[in-house]
Amino acid sequence: MKNNICKAPFFTAEIFGGGDVYLCCPSYTKLNAIGNIFTQSWDEIWNSKEAVEFRNKIKNSDYSDCNMNYCNPNFFPFCREVAYVDPAKLDYDNPKVRIIKFSLDRSCNVACTICRDKVYCNEECRTNFLNSKIDEVFMPLLDGVEIVNFTGTGDPFASKHDREFIKRIAQKYPNIRYDFHTNGILCSKENLERMGVIDKLSTIQISLHSATEETYNKIVKFGNWKLLNKNLEFLSHLIEQNKLNELQLNFVVLSENYKDIPAFIQLCKKYHAKAFLWQYRDIEGVYDYDSVNVCYPLHREHASFIRIMTELDTSNPDLFISPLLRKYTQIKNVDEYLLYADIFSNQNNERYESKNGILGPRLFNIEQQIKQLQLSMEDNKVKKDNILKRIFSVENKYSNNAKHKIITILGLKFIFKIRNKGV
């Protein structure tokens, strides 16, 4: 790994419904779109100034344009295994796209509360527009491509456009293999055969977020737990028959599901799947971020979450924990950590009502609360030998005109958004 570099900008591209093209998942990079497929030629996009500059940075092991909180090879072995290669294997002067992810359609047959608040289906005019671009724009990109991926924005089996596009690819490019990101309900033997890809599968990712039907129904609205497990059973047989390279099950950690984590890992084992744990990001979805983010020490269930995380077997080769979550598995003295987290949390009893009526902690005047914390430490007879310097630090951060506080507790950093009153 020492001298390996990320292959993504030399091999991959992701295309969104508006035509914007990225060299990596936009959540994992600070880089803007390198072009637009509806207004530019592929050569203009792939060899654009932005693309070349990004590749040159990666070539020199400069990852300043990457979001290392989400994609860090030092803390996320999966990233290291699949994305980092020997530089000698890369054609710096004439890179060719080998993997294209099409995130064109937001249509989905369920409403995961992590993602959206209702089922979404493209209007017919939008589907017709995308279908009109299949032969004109999308298919010419696929010469030399080895894998196509559907989709980062919806469910490929619920999208009329994606289903049609996939059928056309399978007919014209029989050697291309497929990665699918899906909720799994429509990922059946019948649908895979209907699209002509059942013998061309590479990886299937399924967003599960649970290990029990009760938890599943809280998070996945309009889902079908029994049908999902039937399809998982089928996919596990494909793994056994070497007809599917990899099955990945995703779990975004929330206050509603974190207690399912141990059972989820066992469920993955049952279905010959790799288990992926992700931290909830304040991007979209129906939740009030503070109320569900058990990673923050102010959350009332943070202690319970920490104990579960520190008991995980991180040596499990089929368990992948995102960098933002992995740090919680590395706490050496759980009782000491929780003592200081609890003391700090007890100083923050002011609460507010958010737009959706869910209560969450308000973080104001943190420096003053640290002073109160010092008094609490004295009351609890905790030794003060430089303890605040060792345990806590507070700093301000400004980004995108938003104010944040960064608090460090026992070496773990927590970034809090400072909200205005009335929010």
Spans of features found by a protein language model:
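Short clusters of small/polar residues that mark proteolytic maturation junctions
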Residues: 25-26, 161, 418
